[in-house]
Amino acid sequence: MSEPLYAPRTPIFPRQISGAFRTAKWWILAVSLGIYLLTPWLRWDRGPNLPDQAVLIDIAGRRFFLFGIQIWPHEFYFVAGLLIMAGLGLFLFTSAAGRVWCGYACPQTVWTDLFLLVERRIEGDRNAQIRLHRQAWTAEKVWKRLLKWSVWAAISLLTGGAWVFYFADAPTLLNGLVTLTAHPVAWITIFVLTATTFVFAGFMREQICIYACPWPRIQAALMDEETITVAYRDWRGEPRGKRSETGRGDCIDCMACVNVCPMGIDIREGQQMACITCGLCIDACDDTMDRIGRPRGLIGYLALSDEHLERAGDTPKPAWRRLFRLRTSLYAVLWAGVGVTLIAALLLRPAVDLAVTPVRNPLFVTLSDGSIRNAYELRLRNMSGEDRRFRLAVDGSAGLRPSIEGSAGLDVPVAANATGLVRLYLTAPQGSDPATGALTDLRIRLDDAGGPEGGPVAAVKAAFHGARS
């Protein structure tokens, strides 16, 4: 019998637990939230006429600033490369340790953990929350819920507010928000992120992971028998029962592993799509084993191949052999390869870029003296920290006369970290070869007119269209 595609949500009230994995999750939460909230306020001196915010996505200026690095619009391949690295990183972690990203560092997990912390501080732990949930709307329930929702809303507002600071100068935007003079886009973005954070982390929680996120389904293609996941050693724990009963396994069916699970699953039923590999059930089970005097590890991180070995009474392989195998090594090599390529491209990129766009409406113009003229839009990017002066030249011109609109010469000054826009005209005399046909081996060259060497710094191929081309 097939299961329904969607099941109505049953509220989950995870019990507070302490242990190594819970501590690791708290540290990751604190560090990741600290980085997210504080990064927009870091300053970085880039000189005059440039923003001093260390990390800034300047949509209006069409540039991305990352400390001492500037990414220009034509360098979007750097962003694509970073996205590829992020994807390969997820493949690597999933192949090695299952959904460890989901359980420890995913924003949905981080904010849900923070909301759960607030919920416990106000309403109490699991049993108190269940009692409050079931009781009628008394004065106690009303004020506790209102207080909890208010704190959630404040966290959500802080989340949305921090995000918009990445897209504008943080102190300036904060002043605009306080004085109610900020751009409407900022207010809309904050509202949307506040609302989604409040709903996703406060009310939907595990449903986002199960129904909205595609990663649980993708991970199936990335995991194999060598992938380390959370597993229940049923050959040791079964049959379940009280410790006073003879012939029973180590599992006393205390339900601690179920009660601490933020996804509400029972790991003893085997690996499930909803499991986010957070390890909280391991902390809960280890605590129970300590109390009843049994060895830890009834629930633990375990590869399927190790499970087969342990069932047979053999010694499992060392963890490093699980992590460093052909699949994970391939992902690691690809990840490192993309990273090295990006670093090399960043270090070797030129300080000047020239982009040429032929004006095609009209394709050419016949002047009063019978000569043919083509027009080109030139975009000169000076990506250095100094003002530069360039001189335009044309190779393979075969008698073409270059000129710049609004200028008597061919020199073009471009300020530091700026883009210069010019219109270049190439004119072919009447009866010349370019005027009567197409000249395709043309090169528009940019020379350094202000430096001591004065050599070419950029060149782009172009075509000249005559009357019969």
Curated annotation (Swiss-Prot):
It is found in: Cell membrane. InterPro entries: 4Fe4S_Fe-S-bd, 4Fe4S_Fe_S_CS, Cyt_c_oxidase_cbb3_FixG, Electron_Trans/Redox, FixG_C, Ig-like_fold. PROSITE patterns: 4FE4S_FER_1 (PS00198), 4FE4S_FER_2 (PS51379). One of its GO terms (cellular component) is plasma membrane. Residues 1-23, 97-149, 205-327 are cytoplasmic. The keyword Iron applies. Residues 45-75, 171-183, 349-469 are periplasmic. [4Fe-4S] cluster 2 binds at residues 261, 275, 278, 281. One of its GO terms (molecular function) is 4 iron, 4 sulfur cluster binding. Residues 242-270, 266-295 form the 4Fe-4S ferredoxin-type domain. It is a multi-pass membrane protein. The chain crosses the membrane at residues 24-44, 76-96, 150-170, 184-204, 328-348. [4Fe-4S] cluster 1 binds at residues 251, 254, 257, 285. Keywords: 4Fe-4S, Cell membrane, Electron transport, Iron, Iron-sulfur, Membrane, Metal-binding, Repeat, Transmembrane, Transmembrane helix, Transport. The keyword Chaperone does not apply. It comes from the Bacteria. Predicted to be involved in a redox process. This is Protein RdxA. It comes from Cereibacter sphaeroides (strain ATCC 17023 / DSM 158 / JCM 6121 / CCUG 31486 / LMG 2827 / NBRC 12203 / NCIMB 8253 / ATH 2.4.1.). The lineage of its organism: Bacteria, Pseudomonadati, Pseudomonadota, Alphaproteobacteria, Rhodobacterales. The gene is rdxA.
